């Protein structure tokens, strides 16, 4: 008998820790017994809702906000990414962009059973391929490989009603107390924040699979 679990995952595309956290989550899922099936539902969150349409220079923003050398701040996430087999060089993606359209097409991929794969693909395009994910054409190219017709993807990511729904969900996540991402909710039973070590994800699933927890 298949045991079904669910993970609600709150991320923002332009958050390097979200990329790392998603990789670690997926590794933990891949290591589960074959009779355990995990649904991952991605939810929108905005690291900075005030980012202008043209984006901002990440290095300048970090230096202005924190008064530190961006290379120094990038060192830790890059090192953590390497531990999980991800070759991350944050200096090669100099700009942070608005993510409403990326979140919208990701949200709408849920009905096509490609949502988590699409979310990962967009994050990888941004951080690893250094693509401009504020560009509709770039997003449409990625979506076309995950169950969307290209023209349909362009229409949906620019639909004012769909964008408004995404905005409402992102605001609701913040209002529920989520202050940083990645943020994980495991089967509605407990939550975890941050790109924790891989063994922490493994322990979380082991806890969920305990008979006394499963019956709650």
Features from the language model and the residues they span:
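Structural alpha/beta surface segment adjacent to cysteine/selenocysteine redox centers
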Residues: 22-126, 211
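C-terminal cap of thioredoxin/glutaredoxin-like
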Residues: 3-10, 14, 20-34, 38, ...
């Amino acid at each position: 008998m298949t045991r079904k679990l669910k993970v609600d995952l709150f991320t923002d595309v332009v958050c390097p820790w979200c990329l790392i956290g998603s990789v670690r989550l997926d590794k933990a899922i891949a290591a589960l017994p074959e009779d355990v099936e995990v649904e991952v539902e991605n939810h929108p969150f905005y690291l900075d809702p005030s980012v202008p349409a043209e984006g901002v220079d990440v290095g300048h923003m970090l230096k202005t906000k924190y008064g530190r050398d961006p290379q120094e701040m990038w060192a830790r996430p890059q090192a953590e990414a390497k531990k999980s087999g991800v070759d991350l060089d944050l200096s090669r993606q100099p700009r942070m962009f608005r993510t409403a359209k990326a979140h919208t097409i990701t949200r709408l991929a849920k009905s096509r059973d490609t949502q988590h794969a699409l979310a990962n693909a967009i994050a990888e395009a941004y951080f690893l391929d250094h693509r401009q994910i504020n560009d509709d054409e770039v997003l449409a190219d990625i979506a076309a490989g995950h169950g969307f017709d290209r023209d349909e993807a362009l229409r949906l990511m620019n639909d004012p009603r769909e964008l408004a729904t995404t905005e409402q969900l992102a605001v609701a996540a913040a209002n529920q107390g989520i202050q940083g991402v990645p943020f994980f909710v495991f089967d509605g039973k407990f939550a975890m924040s941050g790109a924790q070590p891989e063994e922490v994800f493994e322990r979380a699933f082991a806890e969920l699979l305990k008979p006394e927890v499963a019956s709650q």
